[in-house]
């Protein structure tokens, strides 16, 4: 979907195109918005206008929690301040690392304590940026659910960790890739983000990551995270079976072409 000057209207239209979210936007269910931000200085995170549009799309929900956890670069509490202008009595930041009410689960063969918020009847929204990264974006965003500050030990089995987390919390109810900017990623010939002004919204997180990866020049059929998600039955990872509405796919690819150029070796 093209991101117009009125971001909220563009987002609302995108939600309509995927059939709306009446089952998610209800007075009976709170919403967890998993924002993804590794380090604020990198500016690779969902923009405030898109985050505001997400909040506005859940007009009926009694409470929205913007959630993040600590990492070795700092606390989740501090990183969540990026969206502080959106916070109110209804929209609140929450550091998962500070929750003492947890449930122990097994992730990639190891026990892990996760926040109680993740196991109650809440809607889970995962929002991240359009980027060149082999582990995707909205699914990789789940790596911010574990509360520990140092998570490097999980990188050796990262695909399993991410997909186990996906299954343990009941999946992602709404996946959003903010393509206000496209980020080329490590090893790219493009060193800075470029304006793309597109975004992807979908109920199938695997499909959203698949389309996002293809837009950035990657081949989903060669991405282990996507293929493992398919084998587990977690979503659709075949581009031929994914309907993209609201914007021409090839046109979107052309728009972000500068960020897809790779260095020749």
Language model features: what each stretch is:
Residues 1-265:
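N-terminal and secondary-structure boundary signal
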């Amino acid at each position: 979907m093209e991101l117009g000057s009125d971001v909220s209207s563009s987002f609302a239209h995108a939600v309509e195109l995927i059939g709306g979210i009446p089952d998610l936007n209800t007075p009976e269910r709170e919403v967890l918005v998993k924002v993804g931000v590794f380090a604020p200085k990198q500016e690779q995170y969902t923009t405030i206008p898109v985050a505001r549009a997400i909040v506005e799309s859940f007009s009926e929900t009694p409470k929205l929690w913007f959630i993040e956890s600590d990492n070795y670069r700092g606390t989740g509490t501090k990183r969540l301040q990026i969206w502080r202008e959106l916070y109110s009595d209804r929209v609140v930041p929450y550091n998962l690392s500070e929750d003492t009410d947890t449930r122990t689960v097994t992730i990639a063969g190891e026990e892990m304590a996760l926040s109680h918020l993740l196991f109650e009847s809440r809607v889970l929204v995962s929002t991240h940026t359009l980027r060149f990264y082999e582990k995707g974006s909205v699914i990789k965003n789940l790596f911010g659910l574990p509360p520990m500050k140092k998570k490097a030990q999980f990188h050796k089995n990262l695909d399993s960790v991410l997909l186990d987390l996906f299954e343990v919390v009941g999946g992602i109810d709404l996946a959003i890739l903010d393509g206000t900017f496209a980020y080329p990623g490590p090893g790219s010939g493009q060193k800075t983000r470029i304006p793309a002004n597109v975004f992807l919204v979908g109920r199938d997180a695997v499909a959203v990551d698949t389309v996002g990866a293809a837009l950035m020049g990657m081949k989903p059929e060669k991405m282990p995270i996507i293929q493992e998600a398919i084998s587990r039955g977690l979503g659709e990872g075949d581009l031929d079976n994914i309907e993209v509405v609201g914007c021409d796919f090839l046109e979107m690819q052309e728009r972000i072409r500068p960020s897809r150029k790779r260095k020749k070796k």
